[in-house]
C-alpha cells in the first residue's frame, strides 16, 4: 500500500510526518453467537453445543493467533490492534494515573504487551483445552471439525482477502481437524441478512464506544436477561439459549458476570 511504501522509505517526503492514531474510546472484540441458526431457520446444534463448552472457548483464547489478520488493519504495527479487555486503553485512569486496562491486566495475570507476540497465547494450554473439548463434545454428539460460518459482503474483494487470511489463522492456530471457517456472503445488509436471523457463528471486529467514560457502560453490554444489553441482545443472543445440561454452565457464567457488573 502507499502507507507501507512511505513508511519503508526514509527518503520519502512524507515519511517523517507519519503519526499512528488509535481510537480513543472504541473497543472491538470477537463475539460468539450462542444461539446460531442454519439458513433454513433450524438451530445449528453442532455449533451451539460446541460454543457452549468452556474448554472449546478456552482453546480459542489460548490458541488463536490473529497477528496476520491484524495486518489487514495495521500493516505497519499490527500488535497495536491487540486488546484483551472490554475497554480500550486511554478510556479512564485512577487517581494515581494508572490506566484502567492495566488494573484489569494485572487481575488477569497477563504479561505486559510487548509488540512482538500475543500475550494471551499459551500453546500448552491451548492443546490441553482442545483435547478436553474434543473428548467432552464428542460424547455429546458434536462432529469435528466444527464449522464456523463467517459472512462477508458479496463481490467485495478486500473483505474476501481479509476473510482468507482469517481462515488461514484458524487453520494454523487450531488445526483443520478441529475448526474450519466457512466464508459465506450476504447481498446488502449484514444486520438484516445475517445477524438478525442469527446465521453468524461469530462476529469479528464488532464492539462499543460508550457515550461516557465508565467501564461499566462497556461491561453492561454483555449482561444476561437485559434487553438493553447491546452485545447480548444483538450479537451473542445468550438470552435465546435454552437451559439444559449442556448449556447451564454457560448461562451460569453469564449470570455470575451480570451480578458482578
Name each region found by the language model.
Residues 1-2, 22-28, 203-219:
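Ligand-binding clamshell of periplasmic/extracellular solute-binding protein-like
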Residues 50-172:
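Append "and occasionally in soluble cytosolic enzymes with long acidic Gly/Pro-rich linkers
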Residues 57-58, 62, 66, 70-73, ...:
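Extracytoplasmic/peripheral linker and loop segments enriched in polar/acidic and small residues
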Residues 36-56:
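Short helix-loop capping/hinge motifs at secondary-structure junctions, enriched
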Residues 1-39, 73:
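Extracellular/periplasmic solute-recognition and catalytic clefts
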Residues 20-21, 28-33, 59-63, 70-71, ...:
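Structural recognition of the beta-strand scaffold that forms the well-ordered cores
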Amino acid at each position: 500500500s502507499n502507507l507501507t511504501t512511505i513508511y519503508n522509505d526514509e527518503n520519502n517526503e512524507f515519511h517523517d510526518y507519519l503519526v499512528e492514531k488509535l481510537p480513543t474510546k472504541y473497543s472491538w472484540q470477537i463475539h460468539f453467537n450462542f444461539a446460531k441458526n442454519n439458513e433454513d431457520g433450524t438451530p445449528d446444534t453442532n455449533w451451539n453445543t460446541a460454543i457452549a463448552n468452556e474448554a472449546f472457548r478456552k482453546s480459542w483464547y489460548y490458541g488463536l493467533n490473529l497477528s496476520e489478520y491484524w495486518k489487514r488493519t495495521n500493516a505497519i504495527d499490527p500488535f497495536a490492534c491487540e486488546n484483551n479487555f472490554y475497554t480500550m486503553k486511554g478510556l479512564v485512569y485512577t487517581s494515581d494515573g494508572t490506566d484502567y486496562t492495566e488494573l484489569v491486566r494485572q487481575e488477569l495475570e497477563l504479561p505486559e504487551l510487548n509488540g512482538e507476540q500475543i500475550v494471551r497465547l499459551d500453546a500448552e494450554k491451548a492443546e490441553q483445552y482442545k483435547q478436553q473439548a474434543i473428548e467432552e463434545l464428542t460424547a455429546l454428539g458434536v462432529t469435528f471439525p466444527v464449522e464456523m460460518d463467517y459472512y462477508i459482503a458479496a463481490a467485495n474483494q478486500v473483505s474476501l482477502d481479509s476473510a482468507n487470511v482469517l481462515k488461514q489463522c484458524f487453520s494454523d492456530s487450531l488445526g483443520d481437524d478441529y475448526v474450519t471457517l466457512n466464508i459465506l456472503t450476504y447481498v446488502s445488509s449484514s444486520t438484516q441478512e445475517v445477524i438478525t436471523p442469527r446465521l453468524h457463528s461469530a462476529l469479528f471486529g464488532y464492539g462499543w464506544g460508550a457515550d461516557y467514560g465508565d467501564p461499566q457502560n462497556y461491561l453492561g453490554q454483555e449482561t444476561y436477561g437485559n434487553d438493553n444489553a447491546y452485545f447480548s441482545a444483538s450479537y451473542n443472543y445468550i438470552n435465546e439459549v435454552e437451559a439444559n445440561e449442556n448449556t447451564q454452565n454457560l448461562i451460569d457464567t453469564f449470570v455470575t458476570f451480570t451480578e458482578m457488573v
